[in-house]
Amino acid sequence: MEIDFSKYVERKGSNSVKWDMLSETFGKEDLLPMWVADSDWPTSPSIIKAIKKRADHGIFGYTFPDQKLKNIIVNWIKKHYDWDIKKEWIVFSNGVVPSLNIAVQTFTNNGDEVIIQPPVYYPFRSAVENNGAIVVNNQLKNTNGKYKFDLKELKNILKDSPQKLSRAKLLILCSPHNPVGRVWEKEELAELGKICLENDVKILSDEIHADFVYEDNKHTPIASLNNELGQNTLTFMAPSKTFNIAGLNSSFVIIENEKLRKEFMVNKNGLVGTGNIFGLVAMKAAYQNGEKWLSEQLSYLNENMKFAVNYINENIPGITARKSEGTYLLWLDCKGLNLSDSQLEDFIINEANLALDPGLWFGQGGSGYMRMNLACPRSTLKKGLENLKKAVRGDQ
């Protein structure tokens, strides 16, 4: 075993957003943080070794992603997602969220519409609004805890009508989906993609959680389905979630369409770089030598997921959970507690002493829900679940 995922590592005092910004975010310091989507264990030893070696060189001048890194990414994507890409399609950046903002800025004008599918990762909304575009919600359908695209409503949104001042130019896809944990099937993606193609809507596909899939589920990049979707999609990826290196600010965008790629790069190059020295070193080490560590992490996370779902459904009345197909996030249905959203947030903070992401942060369909991060040692997870059980049951 490369590392002991069950070992607690103290993160307080490390300038961790998750652990050191509790007062600023929740108004209370003494909470168990299970919110921000990073992991509470060290990254792969191969990454740490590579960073130390680069640090020992002592000179940290301007840098660039070399051809070897591009080839390593091409091989990773082929092996893990069965997608043949060319290294020329890869555009490096310093994060998925900045890259999404640049894409919205590049491919919309003020007043254009961008479709998102809530409840969904909240920076999608700000990426649209910050760049002068208008958010259009195509809310996911929830059937007994399993979420699906509402394609009928999507068609209605895109239907031309005299009342519409503008039409949608982009759809931001979350795949796998944060926070509901869906790993979209090929057929679902193909139907969604077909509608976008028919209506000249480009797809921005955030696939940062692509490596977190469990059991029989398989991640399929929507751009890999056919040539038309490849030409119509920008795919956003990074090793940051997979290898717990979000603070190193390195990501990439796969853009097959040369015209779109050039337009994106014109805006990007004036705003952000290609990632810092240590981020690029970490990315190379991760995709070249991190396979064993990742496999062990996925096994541990899968057990965490099963443990949490069973514990909640058997021990915590008023809260239900469905095992996520992907991501290390669990979407808790708290509607059975019969609390308003403000009451629920107060209850989680002040009674359960937990820091979770309130469902309302994720937009429409988030009312009555909480998102819990399970990427932590089992002891931390058990403590969080026990806190929740005691609070709900009124145990002392």
Question: Which ranges hold each PLM region?
Answer:
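Short acidic, glycine/Ser/Thr-rich loop/turn "cap" segments at secondary-structure junctions
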Residues: 56-59, 106
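Conserved PLP-binding active-site segment in aminotransferase class I/II-type PLP enzymes
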Residues: 1-18, 27-30
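PLP-dependent class I/II
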Residues: 3, 26-32, 37-52, 85-86, ...
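Conserved N-terminal alpha-helix of the aminotransferase class I/II PLP-enzyme fold
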Residues: 54, 61-94
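Short clusters of hydrophobic/aromatic residues that line enzyme substrate/ligand-binding pockets
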Residues: 8, 17, 60-62, 222, ...
